Amino acid sequence: MKNFMDENFLLQTETAQKLYHEHAAKMPIIDYHCHLIPQMVADDYQFKSLTEIWLGGDHYKWRAMRTNGVDERYCTGKDTTDWEKFEKWAETVPYTFRNPLYHWTHLELKTAFGINKVLNPKTAREIFDECNEKLAKPEYSARGMMRRYHVETVCTTDDPVDSLEYHIKTRESGFEIKMLPTWRPDKAMAVEVPADFRAYMEKLSAVSGVTISSFDDMVAALRKRHDFFAEQGCKLSDHGIEEFYAEDYTDAEINAIFNKVYGGTELTKEEILKFKSAMLIVFGEMDWEKGWTQQFHYGAIRNNNTKMFKLLGPDTGFDSIGEFTTAKAMAKFLDRLNTGKLAKTILYNLNPCANEVIATMLGNFQDGTIPGKIQFGSGWWFLDQKDGMEKQMNALSLLGLLSRFVGMLTDSRSFLSYPRHEYFRRTLCNLLGNDVENGEIPACEIERVNQMVEDICYNNAKKFFQF
């Protein structure tokens, strides 16, 4: 029987162990997509408790706690103490066997705090107190956590109207780790509620200095903000979309649709799809002009629980995997830009049924200008676990080039999520190590395998994003 989470955790063969310990483990972290709060980095925030850094905003844990019968007040309530919330989480942990939360929980305790005990109701108080004592130390601040995990670069997720003041403050402070913004213009496409769209246009107008009264004005304002993001080091965009939009439209139609929604009139479903289709092309061309990488996270159905959405708002654990037929629209969208204006692209699916769809889509638009110009993004959200990672890498291996993969990202709001890179690296090394041991990759090519591991963990992303 193997020990739980020892130095060879997830590494089933000697070759896998060597690949991880001698090659993957030493590589710095490039976290090219995350949801960290920039102000926390700028201010070098000192966390008040383990509950704050670990449970605050973590909808993965909240979902598990609710499923375990824990009352909502211990997840998101304001009338419960940090200890009471943590105690309920500790009661839930033993019920998470085979859920990635169990591995993440103990990997985070081990790597951040040096705690090798399992978390359960008996150990909860001891672990809570020990972690809180350490969190009070300067080396456990927001920046301290990033240093602890050998992070080199992080890319946050930012709205076009954001001032980026905390990115600027962080850079000017001399902090050695790069924190770069990512352009996330979802609200500029959100025309479902006219009043919300109009309010967003007013914010965009104010921050850009462009008076907005037409579609062209809106694009001009967005372009000014896009330029500003580039000045602050931005190299990626990100789009959270249900599905790909590639309806046919004319300029006259889009102008009329803008005027209609800007004037407060609800759009038809067809008009909404046409507008989103036009905006994806506008953003794609902007990104191509700058040499950025465009990312698309698609396939989620969000805010499914109306009662809880009204109570708590978005991103609180009431989203799930959607079922959309997107292959034709995805191909049509990429093809429209493939007239010399297709930027580097990463496609992330939330439904694993689309793994092979994406893996084969990549090859349609690789143009030989750079290795892996169109990427299959790492397992995302509900697929951000061992099985999901393996399936994504297997599909990419079978239908593309795993060796050109830009690797892992946390996609997280937590400063304790960096062990997900370790989890990914161990999974990667186990896949490749097993192939060598099974004679599916020749042992005489081990140096190439060593290099492949280092490339996927770090080098490919460094070159691809030009950090």
Name every feature range the model reports, one short phrase each.
Residues 271, 317-320:
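Metal/cofactor-centered catalytic core regions of large enzymes
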Residues 294-296:
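C-terminal amphipathic alpha-helical interaction region
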Residues 323-330:
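Divalent-cation-assisted or electrostatically stabilized phosphate/pyrophosphate-binding catalytic cores
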Residues 309-317:
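Short glycine/proline- and charge-enriched loop/turn segments
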Residues 333-339:
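Short, basic/hydrophobic alpha-helical segments
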Residues 2-290, 339-343, 347-352, 356-359, ...:
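Metal-cofactor-binding active-site regions of metalloenzymes
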Residues 300, 305:
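Hard-cation-handling environments
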